[in-house]
Structure formats: C-alpha cells, structure tokens
Amino acid sequence: MLTGQEWPATPPPAVRPWLGPAALAGALGVAALTALTLSRQPPPYGFELGVGLAFLAVIGLTVVRIEAAAFIALALLGVIVVDPAPADFVFLVVIAVALVTGRFRASAPPGALVALGGFLAVSLLSAVEVVDHRVAAVYLGISIYLTIAALWLSGFVDSRRRARIVVAGYLTAAVTAAAVGVVAVLAPVPGKELFAASGRATALFQDPNVFGPFLVPTVLILLEDMLNPRLFRMRSLWKAALVGVLVLGVVFSYSRGAWLNLVVGVAVVLTVLALRRGGGRNVVRVAVLACLVTLLVVYVLAATGSTDFLFERARYQEYDSGRFAGQVVGIESAERYPLGIGPGQFESYASISAHSTYVRALAEQGLPGLILIAALLVSTVAAAVTNAVAGRETYGIGSAALLGALCGILVNSVVIDTLHWRHLWIVIALIWAGWARRRMLRRPPAPVAVAR
C-alpha cells in the first residue's frame, strides 16, 4: 500500500495530437455562441468598455502567469448571478492562450474520452430537428465548453503546486460564498434578499440547490487534508473552522439534495479511510469532528430560531409531485423519440424542468445518450475508486475526497440536472489528473545515456 508515500515528480501527460484542434474548434464555437447571445441583448457601452479592458488584462496575465489566471478563474466560481459567468470568460481566455502557446494538455481514461466524444456527437445529431434551434445551440455550446475546460484542467494539474492553486481558488470561492450566504440568512444586512432568496442561502448563485452542492467537494477535500496533511500547511484548527463555515452554508441552503450530497460524500470518505492502514484512528477523528460540527449547526439553528424552517424544508413538498411528473414525461418522450428531442429541449416538451441528469439525457439524447453519459461517469468512478483504494492522491488532493465528491454529485443527479454544474467537471478533471499520474508512475524510466 502506498498511502502517505511522497510521490516523485512525474513528466507531463502525453499530448494527444487531435485534442488541440478539437478543443480549438469547440472554443471558437462557444465564442461565436457567446457573441450571438450578447448581440441579441447588447449591454451598455460603459459595461462593454470595462469588459474589454478586463479581457485584455486577463490575456496579459495568462501569457505571463497562467497559474495566477487559473486561480482567478476558480476564485470567481462563486459569482454565478449571470450566464455566462465572469469565471467562464476567464476560463475561455486561459484555454485559448493555452491552445495558442502549445500549453494545452489533456489526460483522461480512454473509455471516458470515447464516451464523452460519443455523447457530444449524439447531442449534435439530435439537434438537427429541434423546436428551438437557439436554445439547442446554446445548450450544446455550454456542454462543449465544460468538456474543454475539464480536459484542460486535467492536464494543467501536473504538480503539487498547481493542485494547491486549483484547490485554493475553489476554496476561496466556496468559503466566501458560504460566509455571505450564512450572514444573509442570519443577519438583517442591507440587500439580504440578493444573497438569501426566500430565506435560503444563495450568495451570488441563482439557485440554492446549486449553491449548496457547490460547497460539498471543498468540505471533503479539507476533511481528508486534516487527517493526512499534504496540500495545505495551515493548522487543523483553521481547517476545522473552514469546514464549519462550509457546512453551515450547506445547511442554510435548505437544499435536501445538498444535504444528501454531503452525507453520501462523507460516508464514502469514511468508508475509504476505514479500509486503509490505520483507518480506525482516522474514522474516530472524523466522527469527533462530525459531532463537533453537528453541535455547531444545532446551536446556530436553535439560537437563530431556524429549526422550524429546517424541518419544514426536510418534509415532502407540494412541488415534488411536479418534479416526478416531469421525469415521467421525460421517460415517455424517450419512447416516442429514440434519438432524443435535442439538447436543451426538455422544457419545450414539458412544463417543468427534468430535475434529473439521467432523465434529461434519456429524453434529449435518447437511449444512446444515456448509455454514453453513464459510460463516462462509470469510467471516471472506476478511476477514482482505483486511486482511492490504493491511497494515491492527485498531487496532494485526497483521492477519498474526490471519490466522495463525485459519488455525492451522482446521487444528487437523480433529483436535479447537474450536467452543466461547473464543479462537477472540476471534480472529474481532478480525478482524471490523478489517473494520469498513476499511469505515468507505471512507465519505466527513460534510459540515461552515458557519456564516453
């Protein structure tokens, strides 16, 4: 077993020659769709000027320090009040510069790559005859963009330093969003309705059901890093404090899917840690921390009088029947349209959203699309399980945490559409980066020429 072992530096992932042109074509398509969307609703001149200057600044920063630009993109993930979000513009610039300068590398299990390419191809095929071509183009463009971003991130994370940059950026966005959301729920601050819609924490997200799950992967990463410090040098007390803030954010999102996501993720992390050497001690430490965080949550709920609303949210809601009815409509539409109704078209056929990644894939891309997206997720889970069982981290990012984060999202995906969640693709990319590292470590070292 290799748990806790310091891994030697590894060479960068091998470059697949077709990935660069494919990513460039996809990036150009996404840029064209963004321009089309903005042309239909042109912003004020001052806004255009500000965005233009920021765009030039990001280009310059990316050319000089791509790591700094990547950190900014990830730190902006908590600002999702508009689409495209600020983080998306920064990511597009970073990816474009990486393509132009030859720094675009990608690593993914072959099965995942084939399934991903097949899913996008099926999506394109199903988009030929759709009710709303503009919605289909935008939806497919977002899918392509997230795919390219995940592929780029999987190759970008090739050292412990870069892994720390990625997690630090994500953690900055998550902790800031959690703190803003919790304060907006509990304190009578001006403009609190902007950060806590209907009494539920949203921070700068549009939906509390996305805000809550966004925080979960960072909870799990910090949790494993407390037990096996490899990523951050901060004291365990500070990590525990950050976990407390993040968990409060999940709780005050009042999202049952986010709660389930967190419970599943923690359960997976505990199971993996229990199977490792010295697992009993780690499980006890996690259990103690969980009890302390639970006491903190109970105290805050009782002190703020939020207990009644919590129990009300935990019960079956009237709109739940509508959600399940929408899923039934999706399954029925798959019977009528074997190749699917086209990307983003579910709402054109039903009066409600799919509220399930799997039902949406079945309805919009047909049975082939569902099989391909399942193959993508299963191959990624398999890579995550292999790393977690062997104790191989992704350059310091705990493999148990990444497996738990992915499993939590997959369970959450039963009751909400997660395909366009940015943090889903971040988790997938980090798992792929860990898979590539294991593959590199298996390669025999290159022979060293001896001078005569």
Summary of predicted features, one role per range:
Residues 18-101, 125, 129, 409, ...:
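N-terminal signal-anchor transmembrane segment
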Residues 28-31, 54-59, 120-125, 145-148, ...:
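Alpha-helical transmembrane segments of multi-pass inner-membrane proteins
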Residues 29-31, 95-98, 402-410, 417-452:
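Transmembrane alpha-helices of multi-pass inner-membrane enzymes
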Residues 36-46, 81-89, 133-138, 206-209, ...:
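Helix-loop-helix junctions and helix-breaking kinks within/between transmembrane helices
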Residues 56-61, 94-108, 114-179, 411:
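Transmembrane alpha-helical segments and their membrane-water interfaces
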Residues 179, 183-188, 252, 270-318, ...:
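A membrane-periplasm/extracellular boundary helix in multi-pass inner-membrane enzymes
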Residues 191, 311-368, 384-394:
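Long extracytoplasmic/lumenal interhelical loops at the membrane interface
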Residues 271, 367-409, 435-436:
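Hydrophobic transmembrane alpha-helices and their immediate junctions
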